[in-house]
Regions:
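Conserved ATP-binding/catalytic core of the eukaryotic-like protein kinase fold
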Residues: 6, 14, 48, 63-169
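Short N-terminal regulatory/linker segments that flank and modulate the kinase catalytic core
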Residues: 1-77
């Protein structure tokens, strides 16, 4: 894992992440007008403040963990939650108008036929069922060994947060 120390190293990892193209980075740098002596942390903070990337994305790149910030055409914006099957991220794509939730099957389950079947069944059910209490699944996608559901993003609070606010009923 390569941890960036200065802005050129940060920008190299940012480009390698796939979040921004080299041209987009050049345009951002022209707009930000950062000094050459800018540290990786200062560069990341400037890109976040200008909304070129999210705090989650900046943190991952600063840690040297730039892989996985793009999954297929989707750009991972932040972690929404995680569980036994994997993680759920908020994501967007240049060719899609809304942010979505990506439910990504954990790497350890990518070769587990039982978990892949479970993900496919969940996708089928989520695409067929229509109910205000069920989040709509838009599609099931795979890129390489990464399998994931693309779902409508519904903002709200978790059950844990609800119980903390209102107490058990």
């Amino acid at each position: 894992m390569q941890i960036p120390q200065d802005s050129p190293e940060f920008l190299n990892l940012l480009q390698r992440s796939g979040l921004l193209t080299a041209d987009q980075i050049r345009r951002a740098l022209a707009e930000l007008n950062l000094p050459e002596t800018t540290s990786a942390h200062e560069c990341a903070a400037a890109f976040v403040a200008a909304r070129f990337i999210t705090p989650f994305q900046a943190e991952r790149i600063i840690e040297g963990r730039y892989r996985g910030l793009t999954i297929g055409r989707w750009r991972v914006r932040e972690l929404l939650g995680f569980g036994g099957m994997g993680c759920v991220y908020i994501a967007d794509a240049p060719d899609y108008p809304n942010k979505v939730a990506l439910k990504v099957l954990a790497g350890k389950h990518a070769v587990d036929n039982g978990m892949l079947t479970r993900l496919r069944l969940e996708a089928r059910a989520g695409m067929k069922l229509r109910h205000p209490g069920i989040i709509k699944t838009l599609q099931l996608e795979s890129t390489g060994a990464v399998h994931f559901l693309v779902m409508d993003l519904v903002r709200g609070i978790s059950l844990h947060e609800l119980v903390a606010l209102q107490g058990p009923q």
